[in-house]
Amino acid sequence: MAIRLEDKKAIVAEVNETASKALSLVIADYRGVTSNKMSELRAKARAESVSLRVVRNTLARRAVEGTEYECAREAFVGPTILAFSMEDPGAAARLLKDYAKENDKFEIKALAVGGEMLGADQIDRLAKLPTRDQALAMLMSVMQAPVTKLARTLNEIPSKVTRAVAAVRDKKQEAA
């Protein structure tokens, strides 16, 4: 079924807008995946702020022009699904990596981050990135460690004085 030119332009504009706001892109081959399985994937994607699009390859190539994902143009071959991470750079990678483990017909082709295209074998690099909340928690623990150590050190001074006074008291009681 042919798509009208106006519809094609609208699809390209919509995907281009999504791509310009996205933090990362994962490209996968969905050949052989049932529609029920795809519906499950879409539901999981919505929950994790990942935008999934199935677009014709020629339209996808035009849509990524002028964005940082232009480097991924050669990966648009065969049945392709585009997964854009909107809030967390690793969200789409984690989602599709887990989905590919469950569905052996689903294959990750490539991923792109910051204008650099990475192979499917490097999906772990992106999937292992901590979420924003995890990164903030790590940063806070690193920042809190010196303060905690200082508080313990300052708390140790009165403890030492107390132990010294107790030792002097015990010594005087023994002498008396």
UniProtKB/Swiss-Prot annotation:
Purpose of the protein: Forms part of the ribosomal stalk, playing a central role in the interaction of the ribosome with GTP-bound translation factors.
Protein name: Large ribosomal subunit protein uL10
InterPro entries for the chain: Ribosomal_uL10, Ribosomal_uL10-like_sf, Ribosomal_uL10_bac, Ribosomal_uL10_bac_type
Assembly mode: Part of the ribosomal stalk of the 50S ribosomal subunit. The N-terminus interacts with L11 and the large rRNA to form the base of the stalk. The C-terminus forms an elongated spine to which L12 dimers bind in a sequential fashion forming a multimeric L10(L12)X complex.
Keyword tags: Ribonucleoprotein, Ribosomal protein, RNA-binding, rRNA-binding
A cellular component annotation (GO) from this entry: ribosome
Gene assigned in the entry: rplJ
Top-rank taxon, per record: Bacteria
Pfam family for this entry, one: Ribosomal_L10
A single GO BP: translation
Source organism of the structure: Hahella chejuensis (strain KCTC 2396)
HAMAP family found in the cross-reference section: Ribosomal_uL10
Molecular functions (GO terms): large ribosomal subunit rRNA binding
Classification via SUPFAM superfamilies: Ribosomal protein L10-like (SSF160369)
Family recorded in the similarity comment: Belongs to the universal ribosomal protein uL10 family.
